[in-house]
Amino acid sequence: MTRSLKKNPFVVDHLSGKIEKLNMREEKEIIVTWSRGSTIIPAMMGHTIAIHNGKEHFPIYITDQMVGHKLGEFSPTLTFARHTRNDNKSRR
């Protein structure tokens, strides 16, 4: 289900505070966060946010096309481990 339009987009308070401070000082630095459920808002555009994927922080540069999506959509958590081929020729 999508979020109701009556409500504001969800952004963790400490993340929005960091972005507001950087925008006021007009600085660009990497913001580290574990909040994958926060929505990308227009104030985040132009910043690099390092999103935790369960193992490490994955840096993502926020563009205008990402506004409205969640941060976790751009930091994959699973890596596909391919099964070994059952190749009978290699066994001979």
From Swiss-Prot:
* GO biological process terms, semicolon-separated: ribosomal small subunit assembly; translation
- This protein's UniProt keywords: Chloroplast, Plastid, Ribonucleoprotein, Ribosomal protein, RNA-binding, rRNA-binding
| Keyword Disulfide bond included in the entry's annotation | no
Per the record, GO CC terms? chloroplast; mitochondrial small ribosomal subunit
Pfam families with a match to the protein in the record: Ribosomal_S19
Function text: Protein S19 forms a complex with S13 that binds strongly to the 16S ribosomal RNA.
Q: Which GO terms describe its molecular function?
A: rRNA binding; structural constituent of ribosome
* UniProt superkingdom: Eukaryota
Report the InterPro entries cross-referenced here: Ribosomal_uS19 (IPR002222), Ribosomal_uS19_bac-type (IPR005732), Ribosomal_uS19_CS (IPR020934), Ribosomal_uS19_SF (IPR023575)
Please report which protein family the annotation says this sequence is part of.
Belongs to the universal ribosomal protein uS19 family.
| Official protein name in the record | Small ribosomal subunit protein uS19c
* Main localization, broad class: plastid
Places the protein is found: Plastid, Chloroplast
Q: Which NCBIfam families match?
A: rpsS_bact (TIGR01050)
UniProt keyword Transmembrane present: no
